[in-house]
Amino acid sequence: MPKYLTIYHQLAQRIQEGTLPADMKLPSETELMHEFEASRGTVRKAIDALQEKGFVRKHQGKGVFVLSQEAIEFQFNG
């Protein structure tokens, strides 16, 4: 499995479990690089995948924020 998918799955699981609650800012790319021992490009690819699936939203200059699970469920069921 590609490294970015491993990061994606771990972060998605944290969001679903509430470890990373709605409106919380994700750790910085640098922090995630150190935590997962991955390159910046790999971390960005994982974050892009999270955004594509509706787990997070990027706010330029502010960071990446977790979306509410209700919004995610509505996106896929509504």
Language-model segments: residues:
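HTH-adjacent hinge/linker in prokaryotic transcriptional regulators
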Residues: 3-7, 17, 21, 34-35, ...
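A short alpha-helical element within helix-turn-helix/winged-helix DNA-binding domains
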Residues: 25-36
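Residues in the helix-turn-helix
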Residues: 42
